[in-house]
């Protein structure tokens, strides 16, 4: 089972990630990370879509979880009709908690091929000047797409609870 998570940016970086599930654990396998301010060139939605297709590279992706504010990119993916798109759940603080739990429990793992993700983990910080818990809005693009994936895909899991009814004698 494979999936993709997307944090879409125009002037800020776009971070797209290919996830693969094996033996109940999700692995962040590959990433597409494009920072237009560093390259000096913006990309269109179609160019980011081409990057998405290259990232997927023919794998059987079940769903693509996308930043819910990226309406134009969601529309491009839907127009091509190749993938199921889910707008991501976007509660920041609950999502960060869920990612922390998923990492601690080993539900997700980050492969060493995801260098921008690894770099961002070292730079991600809470904003101490705010009166509420919020991260600083820089070096958070891969962190956001991980949060989208965990909040949207891992939250779909069942807790294996069920009710059984039997006939009384």
Regions found by a protein language model. Name each.
Residues 17, 23-137, 156-157, 163-169:
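Mg2+-dependent endonuclease catalytic cores in nucleic-acid-processing enzymes, primarily RNase H-like
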């Amino acid at each position: 089972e494979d999936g993709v998570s997307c944090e879409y940016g125009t002037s800020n970086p776009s971070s797209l990630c290919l996830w693969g599930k094996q033996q109940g654990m999700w692995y962040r396998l590959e990433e597409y990370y494009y920072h237009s301010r560093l390259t000096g060139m913006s990309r269109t939605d179609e160019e980011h879509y081409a990057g998405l297709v290259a990232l997927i590279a023919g794998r059987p992706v079940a769903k693509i979880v996308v930043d819910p504010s990226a309406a134009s990119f969601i529309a491009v993916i839907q127009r091509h009709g190749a993938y199921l798109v889910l707008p991501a759940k976007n509660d920041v603080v609950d999502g960060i908690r869920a990612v922390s739990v998923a990492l601690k429990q080993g539900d997700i793992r980050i492969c060493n091929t995801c260098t921008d993700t690894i770099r961002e983990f070292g730079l991600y910080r809470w904003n101490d000047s705010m009166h509420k818990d919020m991260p600083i809005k820089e070096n958070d693009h891969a962190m956001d797409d991980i949060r989208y994936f965990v909040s949207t895909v891992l939250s779909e899991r069942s807790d294996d609870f069920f009710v059984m009814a039997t006939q009384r004698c």
